[in-house]
């Protein structure tokens, strides 16, 4: 057995099989490149589902982490620490909002948003106790907790995990009429991804997000934008909502917020909305810890200049131009996305998304398939144009054979 085969067999023997990774075992990484245990190099075109927007081993982020490691890493929220105020202030500023509630994982940010919206509904909007409803979109991905899978439409994510949490209404994504009809006086929030990532990088029809904004404002309903994957530079703007000129009531952030170093997530909203919480009503031992705040503070500082957003916009235009040329030739059926983020539907005759991903791996490019024959391309925003072009050449190579 090779070193790789050995490592995989031993991982499979001693871990739950809740993932089906490509047969590659990474040992080190830098920038947009990863190296496996046998010294082979791969271009990372997944970037940890956008957690690695700033690349592997980013100097600024590692320096910020190292400096904080030597000071203090954890206090719990039982005490104040000297990174917390800066982190909350700067992140709120970046979002154009007032208040931040830090958590760790994306799923926790979503859970926090659900609790916030319900409490806001009862205390501010005046919804009768226990009646609050949250509207979500079909084919959503918001995480893996029991409540979140309760409003998933993906059988794989849901099956055998019931009983399910009530209080959610599912409408087709992109359909304003359906959303309007689903709203009642007990609707407290609409929770949506401005671009559906796991569904295959689905961009809603133009006018949809502004329509959601208008409807939610009219009906006194919170518009919660899950920007955990789409936010923080990926689409060529700080937030995907900006492409449609939309400002939601609440941003959910995660993934890139931790710079690929530590898990950091946050709910960002107004003082009124997040003001529903009183001490003891919600929290997390690790949420807003000093190490997380130090790294995320650096992430926010990097985003403040706009350089990463601009890079994603420019390279993204190039990416979509090149991918667009592949459509119609028989191999690629459709390409969607914004900025450095693309969902590519490969003709099923050429193989499943998994088979295509494996062939790309053999050529030194790592991507992840999603439903059926779709692969998603989302390299770190620090990728060079030359490397991006090389990666695209490998994709063309796979599609030719
Ligand atoms: C990844 C993701 C989540 C969940 O984040 P975790 O950190 O994996 O819990 C939620 N929403 C969206 C849109 C995501 O892409």
Task: Cite the ranges covered by each PLM segment.
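Conserved N-terminal phosphate-binding loop of PLP-dependent enzymes in the Aspartate aminotransferase
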Residues: 1-401
């Amino acid at each position: 057995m090779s070193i790789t085969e050995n490592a995989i067999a031993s991982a499979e023997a001693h871990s739950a099989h809740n993932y089906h990774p490509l047969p590659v075992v990474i040992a080190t990484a830098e920038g947009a490149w990863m190296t496996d245990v046998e010294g082979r190099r791969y271009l990372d075109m997944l970037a940890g589902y956008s957690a690695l927007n700033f690349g592997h081993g980013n100097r600024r982020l590692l320096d910020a982490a190292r400096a904080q490691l030597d000071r203090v890493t954890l206090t719990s929220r039982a005490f104040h620490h000297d990174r917390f105020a800066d982190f909350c202030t700067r992140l709120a500023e970046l979002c154009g909002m007032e208040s931040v509630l830090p958590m760790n994982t994306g799923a926790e940010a979503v859970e926090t948003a659900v609790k916030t919206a319900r409490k806001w509904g009862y205390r501010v909007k005046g919804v009768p106790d226990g009646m609050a409803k949250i509207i979500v979109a079909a084919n959503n991905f918001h995480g893996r907790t029991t409540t979140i899978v309760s409003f998933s439409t993906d059988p794989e994510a849901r099956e055998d995990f019931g009983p399910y949490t009530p209080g959610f209404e599912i409408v087709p994504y992109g359909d304003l009429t359906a959303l309007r009809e689903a709203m009642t006086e007990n609707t407290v929030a609409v929770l949506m991804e401005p671009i559906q990532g796991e569904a295959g990088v689905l961009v809603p029809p133009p006018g949809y997000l502004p329509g959601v904004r208008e409807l939610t404002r009219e009906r006194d309903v919170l518009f919660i934008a899950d920007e955990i994957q789409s936010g923080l530079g990926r689409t060529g703007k700080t937030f995907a909502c900006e492409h449609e000129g939309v400002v939601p009531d609440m941003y959910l952030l995660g993934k890139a917020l931790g710079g690929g170093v530590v898990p950091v997530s946050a709910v960002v909203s107004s003082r009124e909305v997040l003001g529903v919480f009183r001490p003891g009503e919600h929290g997390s031992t690790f949420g807003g810890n000093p190490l997380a705040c130090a790294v995320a503070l650096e992430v926010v500082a990097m985003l403040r200049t706009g350089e990463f957003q601009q890079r994603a916009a420019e390279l993204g235009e190039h990416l979509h131009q090149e991918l667009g040329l592949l459509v119609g030739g028989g191999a690629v059926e459709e390409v969607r996305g914004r900025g450095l983020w693309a969902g590519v539907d490969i003709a099923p005759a050429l193989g499943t998304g998994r088979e295509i991903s494996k062939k790309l791996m053999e050529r030194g490019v790592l991507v992840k398939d999603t439903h059926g024959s779709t692969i998603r391309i989302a390299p770190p925003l620090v990728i060079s144009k030359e490397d991006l072009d090389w990666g695209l050449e490998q994709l063309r190579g796979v599609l030719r054979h």
